[in-house]
Each structure stands twice: as structure tokens, then as C-alpha cells.
């Protein structure tokens, strides 16, 4: 594979410049998502920040000093604008304004998540309230098809490599979709 050595050199120079200017005596500004965020839920679970109290109830031990953001875009902008900030977003939301943290020496990448070396990952789920309309089922079938998985992959998320081709059930209608701001 070809490499963009100009971009690599610029990234190395930027990293060197940032490292030289970074004052290790400064406090790190912790950013977190709002209560109810699926990204926050996954993060606190994966990192052991969520524990159970004596009664078995889940307790979120995110620091009280965390700056709370209400969306992925606000998280990215906030981290990008503060060299002492740290936060979290889904892999597909990463852009060149922030740098992902390596976990146990593994970079955040589709390949490393698929091979298990980057262990901080979560699935996205489709949830419905009971039975769905034929149009909604057709939409779900599309998402789970090779064509739908290609859209997922093309947008930076991890799709399935073994999905079958989409076969419409011929339904028409309106489907209401809501959920994570990560997708």
C-alpha cells in the first residue's frame, strides 16, 4: 500500500511540537457524554467506570468534574480545541481534529477491532417495540444486507463481511428511525 509521506511527516512534526509544548503539570480536562448516551453507557462499562452498589444497582463513577457534552460533534469540537482534554467517541466518528488513544499498544482501527487487538469496541443494535411494519422490516433487511453493510463500512464503522445481497420484500411506506448521534 502506498503511504502519504508528506502527511506522515506533518503528523510526526505536529506530534513533536505538541509534545514539546505539553505541560504535564496541567490538569487533564475530562469530557463525558450526557446520562442516557449509548456511547457513555458503553464507555463506562468497557472501562469499569460503572460498578454495582451493595444493593446491586448500577453506579456511574464518572468524575463529578467531567465536562458534559450532549453530542458527538460537541465532544469532538471540545477535545480538538483543548490540548488538555480527553473524551470519547465511536470509531466511525473520529476525524483528523483529534487523535485516538492506543489501547495496550494497539491503534484504534477497523482491522485491530476485527482481530481483537483493540479491545474497546461495542456493537450497534437495532431495537424495535414489538413487531415491525413490512416497510420497517424491508429497511432492516437492507441494513443487514451486503449493500447496507457497505454503507456502514463506507462511513467508518465496522460492517459484516459475510452479508447476503439485499432482496426487497416490495414494501413501501414511512419508517421512523431514531437513536445514537454516532450513526
Which role does the model predict for each range below?
Residues 1-183:
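Exported/periplasmic ABC-transporter solute-binding proteins
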Amino acid at each position: 500500500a502506498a503511504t502519504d509521506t508528506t502527511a506522515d511527516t506533518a503528523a510526526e512534526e505536529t506530534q513533536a511540537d505538541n509534545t514539546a509544548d505539553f505541560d504535564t503539570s496541567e490538569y487533564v480536562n475530562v469530557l463525558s457524554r450526557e446520562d442516557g448516551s449509548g456511547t457513555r453507557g458503553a464507555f463506562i462499562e468497557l472501562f469499569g467506570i460503572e460498578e454495582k452498589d451493595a444493593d446491586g444497582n448500577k453506579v456511574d463513577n464518572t468524575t463529578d468534574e467531567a465536562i458534559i457534552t450532549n453530542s458527538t460533534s460537541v465532544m469532538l469540537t471540545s477535545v480538538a480545541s483543548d490540548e488538555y482534554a480527553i473524551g470519547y467517541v465511536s470509531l466511525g466518528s473520529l476525524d483528523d481534529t483529534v487523535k485516538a488513544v492506543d489501547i495496550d499498544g494497539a491503534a484504534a482501527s477497523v482491522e485491530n477491532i476485527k482481530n481483537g487487538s483493540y479491545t474497546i469496541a461495542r456493537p450497534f443494535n437495532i431495537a424495535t417495540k414489538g413487531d415491525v411494519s413490512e416497510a420497517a422490516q424491508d429497511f432492516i433487511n437492507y441494513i443487514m444486507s451486503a449493500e447496507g453493510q457497505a454503507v456502514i463500512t463506507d462511513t467508518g464503522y465496522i460492517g459484516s463481511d459475510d452479508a447476503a445481497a439485499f432482496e426487497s420484500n416490495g414494501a413501501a411506506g414511512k419508517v421512523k428511525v431514531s437513536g445514537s448521534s454516532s450513526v
